[in-house]
Amino acid sequence: MAEISLTFPDGAIKKFDEGIKPIGVAESISKSLAKKSVSGKINGSYIGMNDVITESGDFQLITTSDSEALDLLRHSASHLLAQALKRIPKFANIHFGVGPFIENGFYYDTDNGAGNQVSIEDFPEIEAIMHKIVKEDLPILSREITRDEALEIFADDPYKVELVNDLPVDEKITIAVQGDHIELDKGGLVPSTGWIKHFKLTSVAGAYWRGDSSNPMMQRVYGTAFWKAADVEAEIARREEAKERDHRVIGRDLDLFFTSQEVGSGLPVWLPNGATIRRQVERYITDKELSNGYQHVYTPVLSNLNLYKTSGHWDHYREDMFPPMDMGDGEFLELRPMNCPSHIMVFNHKPRSYRELPMRIAELGMMHRYEKSGALTGLSRVREMTLNDGHTFVEPEKLEEEFKSILTMMMGVYRDFNIKDYRFRLSYRDPKNTEKYFDDDEMWEKSQKQLKTAMDDLGLDYFEAEGEAAFYGPKLDVQTKTALGNEETLSTIQLDFLLPERFDLKYIGRDGLDNHRPVMLHRGIVGTMERFTAYLIEMYKGAFPTWLSPLQVQIIPVNLGAHGNYANAVQQKLQDAGLRANVETKDAKMGYLIREAQTNKIPYTLVLGDSEVNSNTVTVRKYGDTKTVTMSYDEFQYLILSDVSNYSRETE
């Protein structure tokens, strides 16, 4: 009998009879390995545990201990969901789009016709049938078929037919079969439905087919799955917490912002409370940058299209830009998608000397991005945004020093906002594919070493990501997890060798020659005001630290007639001290007014009655506390001003 040769991750090479399956390979090693093996991998492609290995090559067994096994479980759970739906009479003719795994779960896009779509109310019935199919322990097998066979199998499902027709002519087409259910699938599934024991359907949302608003709207059914029931329960609890932190919900409840189709999709309107938070952030970051040697500028939100042709944005970023405006005189103006070309113009508008370097330019610059409507979300994904942007033009030999300076400032900002959960990622070019990057090997090697040395000198932990650098230079990303569990980039320091060349930037060097080229560093400390505010809303759960809170003090007179004048006097003193205070004038019970102040997450509530008026004191209740403390007005003012000046951190 012919043999195949399999090379294992440890380098070992073993021969097996032709017709061997991954389960047989696993059993030849140990029964315990076979029991926990989810899938095989041959030459980088998944192969089911019960499918025949048809070629020699690199082989790997994926077990439940491997992180990617969870992806396979969730992918399989989406198929389980589809099979269960087809068994429910009212969904017997349902059409399916795609059903991938995603971070923390899975989804399947479905279309059952207008007025009869899948809803949350259907979940108990769907889950019951899913559990029944799990007990049936149906084997999941892959099979290669022809294009004609695929079109015949999925003839009644227009979305699957479209997917088949879009496949390249020479591409292999495979299906996954579990009982009476067939999926168009490339592999990466558990051995049988019996493996998918612990899952939960979580939500339903509308989603355009293939993310295109010109296509039909489908129902996207979301779920999650884990190897252990406890992990499912923990994930559901995390999601419930995430709902409570959702910046869109809190933004509505606390009157921070709103969005409206009448105004336009992706164009949030900042209400007074939200505008106050944003103003505090803007003032803070501007002052921080000024104190670190930055020069703040204002540059136009519109620029000549040629500026973006020179920068390369028009060639590589056009689909994310709004169409140019024809001014009728040969000039085309463009809503800027980025601020860097404008800052380059600031540097380049007159001759520069090394004595002016590093030149640090910063701006709260408004930008516009042509985002599809399906991608828009509250403040975190918008079409108009204001970026805390900065660019430094530096001598190449001073790069490491400037990098440290920016990074030190970043960490000071995180400290003031009480941001603790973040990690550093250094992104390098791919050493095996250098032709993808700006062509200057010496500059790449030197700059990557400088960034690494700077991180080491500062004693910071980081991980390195080869191949993740931009075309024009290495970078540092600061990664964080939002309260909703999504990883996003909080800050970036990006080295750029390309734009100084494209715009022919030069400065007069120490040798008196004017042919020296600066290195450009792009950096964003807090990103856009929109996304950063969304992040803060969710991180603080709407209970902002005193220095950021829209209203810092709510003053409640026990009787407006008897104590109103004193309340107004206290308010005036607080406002004179630069604080934001309000006197409650509603005619309601004291308990209700105090609860309302707590619901609105106001840091300090003052209750003023006869005793306080007569003794020139205030009775103070901090947000989240049940106890009150009576103190002199001067003591309270000192307390709250100390709180504000210390960014509401615990005294160190």
From Swiss-Prot:
UniProt binding sites for Zn(2+): 340, 391, 522
Subcellular locations according to the entry: Cytoplasm
One GO term of the biological process aspect: threonyl-tRNA aminoacylation
GO molecular function: ATP binding; catalytic activity, acting on a protein; metal ion binding; threonine-tRNA ligase activity; transferase activity; tRNA binding
Cofactor comment: Binds 1 zinc ion per subunit.
Region (Catalytic): 246-545
Cofactor: Zn(2+)
Catalytic activity: tRNA(Thr) + L-threonine + ATP = L-threonyl-tRNA(Thr) + AMP + diphosphate + H(+)
EC number: 6.1.1.3
One cellular-component annotation, GO: cytoplasm
Keyword terms of this UniProt record: Aminoacyl-tRNA synthetase, ATP-binding, Cytoplasm, Ligase, Metal-binding, Nucleotide-binding, Protein biosynthesis, RNA-binding, tRNA-binding, Zinc
Record-annotated TGS domain positions: 1-63
Entry coiled-coil feature ranges: none
Pfam families linked to this entry: HGTP_anticodon (PF03129), TGS (PF02824), tRNA-synt_2b (PF00587), tRNA_SAD (PF07973)
InterPro entries membership: aa-tRNA-synt_IIb, aa-tRNA-synth_II, aa-tRNA-synth_II/BPL/LPL, Anticodon-bd, Anticodon-bd_dom_sf, Beta-grasp_dom_sf, TGS, TGS-like
Primary subcellular site in the record, as a coarse category: cytoplasm
Subunit structure and binding partners: Homodimer.
Physiological role: Catalyzes the attachment of threonine to tRNA(Thr) in a two-step reaction: L-threonine is first activated by ATP to form Thr-AMP and then transferred to the acceptor end of tRNA(Thr). Also edits incorrectly charged L-seryl-tRNA(Thr).
Family: Belongs to the class-II aminoacyl-tRNA synthetase family.
Protein's recorded name: Threonine--tRNA ligase
Organism: Leuconostoc mesenteroides subsp. mesenteroides (strain ATCC 8293 / DSM 20343 / BCRC 11652 / CCM 1803 / JCM 6124 / NCDO 523 / NBRC 100496 / NCIMB 8023 / NCTC 12954 / NRRL B-1118 / 37Y)
